[in-house]
């Protein structure tokens, strides 16, 4: 059978301290690329080298355990990343506003509640680079506003690699651009160059 490569022989260097926006059409492989960079999904060939502390894709719940409570999940993640479990737990409990559900297993959570916990876990860690799949909304406008504010605070001392099909979102957060198309990733020297090339694809 002929194999279909989502990412075909992709090779790229992401500069430290630079926020990179990766544009691509729906289904181009943007989310797959982020999962590979973050370590949530291994590449079929080659390797990913990181010399800074990189987050998992924000709002990606793959590292959360359905049988554990919200509190237990946050303490587990804190230990894995060398953070203070008590401080991590306190931040997540206050930030998510899950109430009694914070002490209930994740299998009882709605999708929005799981997203809240995943957001909080991401914000509780001081990463050098955050991986962002769009600026994910939770369906709760008030919480989404709080999340964006917390995210902007983190970006004062960190960079991001963001994937999106929305050029306005990329322009809001990023300074350098790239395009993923046909399984290939092309880096550009400036964001304007990337946006111009992306506009050609979408025309």
List the predicted regions and their residue ranges.
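Conserved beta-strand-loop-alpha-helix hinge in the C-terminal portion
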Residues: 146, 184-203
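ABC ATPase nucleotide-binding domain signature region
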Residues: 16-79
């Amino acid at each position: 059978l002929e194999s279909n490569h989502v990412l075909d022989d992709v090779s790229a260097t992401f500069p430290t301290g630079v926020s990179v926006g990766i544009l691509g059409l729906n289904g181009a492989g943007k989310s797959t690329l982020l999962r590979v960079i973050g370590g949530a999904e291994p590449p079929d060939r080659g390797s990913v080298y990181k010399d800074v502390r990189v987050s998992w894709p924000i709002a990606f719940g793959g590292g959360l355990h359905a049988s554990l409570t919200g509190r237990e999940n946050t303490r587990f993640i804190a230990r894995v990343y060398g953070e203070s479990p008590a401080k991590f737990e306190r931040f997540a409990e206050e930030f998510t506003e899950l109430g009694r559900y914070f002490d209930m297993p994740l299998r009882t959570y709605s999708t929005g509640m799981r997203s809240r916990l995943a957001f909080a876990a991401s914000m509780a860690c001081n990463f050098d680079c955050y991986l962002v799949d769009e600026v994910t909304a939770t369906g709760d406008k008030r919480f989404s506003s709080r999340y964006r504010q917390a995210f902007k605070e983190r970006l004062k001392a960190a960079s991001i690699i963001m994937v999106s099909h929305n050029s306005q979102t990329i322009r809001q957060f990023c300074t350098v651009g790239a395009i993923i198309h046909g399984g290939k990733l092309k880096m550009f020297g400036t964001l304007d160059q990337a946006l111009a090339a992306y506009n050609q694809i979408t025309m």
